[in-house]
UniProtKB/Swiss-Prot annotation:
Enzyme Commission numbers on file: 1.2.1.-, 1.2.1.47, 1.2.1.19, 1.2.1.8
Record keywords, A-Z: Metal-binding, NAD, Oxidoreductase, Sodium
PROSITE patterns from the UniProt entry: ALDEHYDE_DEHYDR_CYS (PS00070), ALDEHYDE_DEHYDR_GLU (PS00687)
UniProt cross-references to Pfam families, sorted A to Z: Aldedh
Matches recorded under InterPro entries: Ald_DH/histidinol_DH, Ald_DH_C, Ald_DH_CS_CYS, Ald_DH_CS_GLU, Ald_DH_N, Aldehyde_DH_dom
Active site: E263 (proton acceptor), C297 (nucleophile)
Family of the protein in this entry: Belongs to the aldehyde dehydrogenase family.
Encoding gene, per UniProt annotation: AMADH1B
Residues binding NAD(+): T162, P163, W164, K188, P189, S190, E191, S242, F243, E244, T245, E263, E396, W462
Record pathway: Amine and polyamine biosynthesis; betaine biosynthesis via choline pathway; betaine from betaine aldehyde: step 1/1
Known role: Dehydrogenase that catalyzes the oxidation of several aminoaldehydes. Metabolizes and detoxifies aldehyde products of polyamine degradation to non-toxic amino acids. Catalyzes the oxidation of 4-aminobutanal and 3-aminopropanal to 4-aminobutanoate and beta-alanine, respectively. Catalyzes the oxidation of 4-(trimethylamino)butanal and 4-guanidinobutanal to 4-trimethylammoniobutanoate and 4-guanidinobutanoate, respectively. Catalyzes the oxidation of betaine aldehyde to glycine betaine.
Designated name of the protein: Aminoaldehyde dehydrogenase 1b
Catalysed reactions, as listed in the record: 4-aminobutanal + NAD(+) + H2O = 4-aminobutanoate + NADH + 2 H(+); 3-aminopropanal + NAD(+) + H2O = beta-alanine + NADH + 2 H(+); 4-(trimethylamino)butanal + NAD(+) + H2O = 4-(trimethylamino)butanoate + NADH + 2 H(+); 4-guanidinobutanal + NAD(+) + H2O = 4-guanidinobutanoate + NADH + 2 H(+)
Gene3D superfamilies: Aldehyde Dehydrogenase, Chain A, domain 1 (3.40.605.10), Aldehyde Dehydrogenase, Chain A, domain 2 (3.40.309.10)
């Protein structure tokens, strides 16, 4: 079935285990970026709906003095997470198709994402079970008259605000560890891609997740995201999205000294030396920038290529880029779909136009594919003749646009790689392992890829430096983002403390 023939399910907000219409009765259109057609609606939640969701989450934590969820053994919560994972796999094809319709992601990528969603729920089910073994862990003290242990308790009600580029996967990165820790959550997905997150609600209902443990409020950022960030009864906010929105979330949380985790933008480098297999390096370079239609926070969108191979490398990149199938995401073999919205489409075109006006050269792409009359499609774009003062070098485009600059020495490559306000990721491609190790240490980023770009595993931590945010998601520490550590120290001597003189001995 082609994208133009399909619609998305009609859903309401998910609050306290039930479907509820938004308080103000408004809905937002779902636009298929492939056809520009309206293919459904999502509820437009507002502050009233956020209040109801937060209240439901708080009630879920308190129910039965916490024994139903927050204080239940991690093994109990793990059963729910595994049940969710199983349902995601059961509905994998349906969910992947919905993401292709909703945000333009090629179907094969979306199907891969669903495997990752299930794997992430499974991984944090393991972490929930491991949490039982970590509870009451002893602390060695220098005084034998005391003993100490640590409790790890859920931080409370958490607000989770997620982006549109990996709609269900990015939500899962937050929902799975939060629930594993025993928190109750309110999820606010991007209004540009909320469809599969609402299907997650349906899955949670189907597996019998206790009411209020996960609530999902869709809507616009100012109407639903902002009230969630500033809500006095939300104990923590975790956000993935733009730098500008991240600043607003920090400002909203600051008056209550509320902890936040922020995974923001990037302008990541990929450094290619002259000792590489050029075809292999070209494919990783293009994958690092054009995967997910170029809409990845960690996209290695600044190519630094050694002068000795630059001409051949650029020629091969152009040939490979022209061979990428740009099409309806549901067509077999699609490798680049449309960007998510008209607004994003116009923004990317403006970046390309500005680069040309500043003197850059468009090697290939930069326009709508000739065979696609509708949809928010942009050909894979490669830009050269870049200076470090250009907007295209400094600002995150969030589209299929790669800018290229040459270097002559390793020191120059390191300097150019770090010439950014962001610090999410970086990649180095070289046959010299020691050189790769040096650059892994020198590049200022939270994630470094060697001889590849963009692999991501939920077993390894994810996060960035500088304007790419702070905190780390995933990995063994992922669950700790949603835990509060409590020290319990006990005096165990039979002797009195003896600091003050007892009145009975006067």
């Amino acid at each position: 079935m082609m994208a133009s023939q399909a619609m998305v399910p009609l859903r309401q907000l998910f609050v306290d285990g039930e479907w509820r219409p938004p308080a103000q009765g408004r809905r937002l259109p779902v636009v298929n970026p492939t056809t520009e057609a309206h293919i459904g609606e999502i509820p437009a939640g507002t502050a009233e709906d956020v209040d109801a969701a937060v209240a439901a989450a708080r009630a879920a934590l308190k129910r039965n003095r916490g024994r139903d969820w927050a204080r239940a053994p991690g093994a109990v919560r793990a059963k729910y997470l595994r049940a969710i994972a199983a349902k995601v796999i059961e509905r994998k094809q349906e969910l992947a198709k919905l993401e292709a319709l909703d945000c333009g992601k090629p179907y094969d990528e979306a199907a891969w994402d669903m495997d990752d969603v299930a794997g992430c729920f499974e991984y944090f089910a393991d972490q929930a079970e491991a949490l039982d073994k970590r509870q009451n862990s002893p602390v060695s003290l220098p005084m034998e008259t005391f003993k100490c242990h640590l409790r790890r308790e859920p931080i409370g009600v958490v607000g989770l605000i997620t982006p549109w580029n990996y709609p269900l996967l990015m939500a899962t990165w937050k929902v799975a560890p939060a629930l594993a820790a025993g928190c109750a959550a309110v999820l606010k997905p991007s209004e540009l891609a909320s469809v599969t997150c609402l299907e997650l609600a349906d899955i949670c209902k189907e597996v019998g997740l206790p009411p209020g443990v996960l609530n999902i409020v869709t809507g616009l950022g100012p109407d639903a995201g902002a009230p969630l960030s500033a809500h006095p009864d939300v104990d923590k906010v975790a956000f993935t999205g733009s730098f500008e929105t991240g600043k607003k979330i920090m400002a909203a949380a600051a008056p209550m000294v509320k902890p936040v985790t922020l995974e923001l933008g990037g302008k990541s480098p990929i450094v290619v030396f002259d000792d590489v297999d050029i075809d292999k390096a070209v494919e990783w370079t293009l994958f690092g920038c054009f995967w997910t239609n170029g809409q990845i926070c960690s996209a290695t969108s600044r190519l630094l290529v050694h002068t000795k191979i630059a001409k051949e490398f650029n020629e091969k990149m152009v040939a490979w880029a022209k061979n990428i199938k740009v099409s309806d995401p549901l067509e077999e073999g699609c490798r680049l779909g449309p960007v998510v919205s008209e607004g994003q489409y116009e923004k990317i075109k403006k970046f390309i136009l500005n680069a040309k006006s500043e003197g850059a050269t468009i090697l290939t792409g930069g326009v709508r594919p000739a065979h696609l009359e509708k949809g928010f499609f942009i050909e894979p774009t490669i830009i050269t003749d870049i200076t470090t003062s250009m907007e295209i070098w400094r600002e995150e485009v969030f589209g299929p646009v790669l800018c290229v600059k040459e270097f002559s020495t390793e020191d120059e490559a390191i300097e150019l790689a770090n010439d950014t306000q962001y610090g999410l990721a970086g990649a180095v491609i070289s046959g010299d392992r020691e050189r790769c190790q040096r650059l892994s240490e020198e590049i200022d980023a939270g994630i470094i890829w060697v001889n590849c770009s963009q692999p991501c595993f939920c077993q390894a931590p994810w996060g960035g430096n500088k304007r790419s945010g702070f905190g780390r998601e995933l990995g063994e520490g992922g669950i700790d983002n949603y835990l509060s550590v409590k020290q319990v120290t006990e005096y165990i001597s039979d002797e009195p403390w003896g600091w003050y003189r007892s009145p009975s001995k006067l």
